[in-house]
Amino acid sequence: METKTVAITMGDPAGIGPEIIVKALSEDGLNGAPLVVIGCLATLKCLQAKGITPNVELRAIERVAEARFAPGIIHVIDEPLAQPEALEAGKVQAQAGDLAYRCVKRATELALRGDVQAIATAPLNKEALHLAGHNYPGHTELLATLTHSRDYAMVLYTDKLKVIHVSTHIALRKFLDTLSTTRVETVIGIADTFLKRVGYVKPRIAVAGVNPHAGENGLFGDEETRILTPAITDARAKGMDVYGPCPPDTVFLQAYEGQYDMVVAMYHDQGHIPLKLLGFYDGVNITAGLPFIRTSADHGTAFDIAWTGKAKSESMAVSIKLAMQLA
C-alpha cells in the first residue's frame, strides 16, 4: 500500500509551533510515522538544547523521498531563518513571519507535486506575516491563493461538533455587506462535499441564522428571509439535506447532541466560540475546498508561553492524526 506522507509546517518560530511539533511527533501513534517537518532546523535544535523538547534525532533532508521513517527520528526540510541568532521568543518579528510564509509555500508545492498527500500547519502570527510583506488574513486565505482555489471555507472539526464558516477574517461591521445568497449556497455545497469525503453518506447540514432567533420572521432583521432561505432552497433542490435558518443560540448544541452533522456559521466568532468551548484541546482547523487536505491546531502562537516548555501539544497531535486519516 502506498505510504501517505504529511508535511508539517513550523508556523511562527517565535511561538509555540516548534515546541508542539516535536512534542507531538514524539508521542505514541506519531513517533516514526510518515511525517516531514518544514521549518528552521536551527530553531528546533535550539529548543532541544534548552531542554524544552524531547531528545529525538532531528535529521535534515532535502527531499521527501530521502526520509527513512523510524521511531526516534524527525525528518526536517530546512527553511532557515535569515538571522536565527536574532530570533526572540514571544515577539512579533518580520523574519519569523517570512519563515512561516515560506514553510507554507514549500509545503504547498510538495502537496501539489504529490510528494506529500496532506499538510498540517502549526500556528502563524498574522501581524508578523504582514510585517514581512505577506498580506494575508491567515493560513486559509494564503493557501487558497497559493493553490488558486476560488471556493473554499474554514472548518472547525471535533468528533462531536463540526462547523464551517461563511466568513472568517473580516470585521463584523463589514460582514453583512459581503453576505450573499451565492456565498452561503457555495459554503453549503463545500460542507456537503467535505462531509461525504470523510465518510458521511447523506450529511445533515444546519444553517445558522445571522440575527437573534434567526430573525424571528423579520422582527430582528431580514437577512434570513432575503439571503439565507434562498440559498437553503437552492441547496435542497440539488439534493442536499439542509435545515434552517436555525436560531444561532441553540443550533450548535443540537449538532453537538447529534441532530446535525455540521453547522454553517455565518461569521468567525459565531462558529469559533461554541467549538472552542466544547473542544478546545481536540479541535482541528481544516481548509475545505483545497486540492489537498490541510489541517491545523485550533489555537494561536501563544507568545506568552513560547519557549517555556508549558505548551500543550494535544491539538497539534490531533490535527496531524486527522491529516493522516483523511489524506
From Swiss-Prot:
Disulfide pairings: none
Catalyses which reaction(s): 4-O-phospho-D-threonate + NAD(+) = dihydroxyacetone phosphate + CO2 + NADH
Recorded GO MF terms: metal ion binding; NAD binding; oxidoreductase activity
Pfam entry (one): PdxA
Function noted in UniProt: Catalyzes the NAD-dependent oxidation and subsequent decarboxylation of D-threonate 4-phosphate to produce dihydroxyacetone phosphate (DHAP).
Name the UniProt record assigns to this protein: Putative D-threonate 4-phosphate dehydrogenase
KW Oxidoreductase (keyword) present: yes
Entry's EC annotation: 1.1.1.408
Cofactor(s) this protein requires: a divalent metal cation
Sorted UniProt keywords: Carbohydrate metabolism, Metal-binding, NAD, Oxidoreductase
InterPro entries in alphabetical order: PdxA_fam
Subunit details: Homodimer.
UniProt enzyme class: oxidoreductase
Keyword check for Cell division: no
Cofactor comment: Binds 1 divalent metal cation per subunit.
Family indicated by similarity: Belongs to the PdxA family. PdxA2 subfamily.
Residues the entry annotates as binding substrate: 139-140, 276, 285, 294
Amino acids binding a divalent metal cation: 169, 213, 268
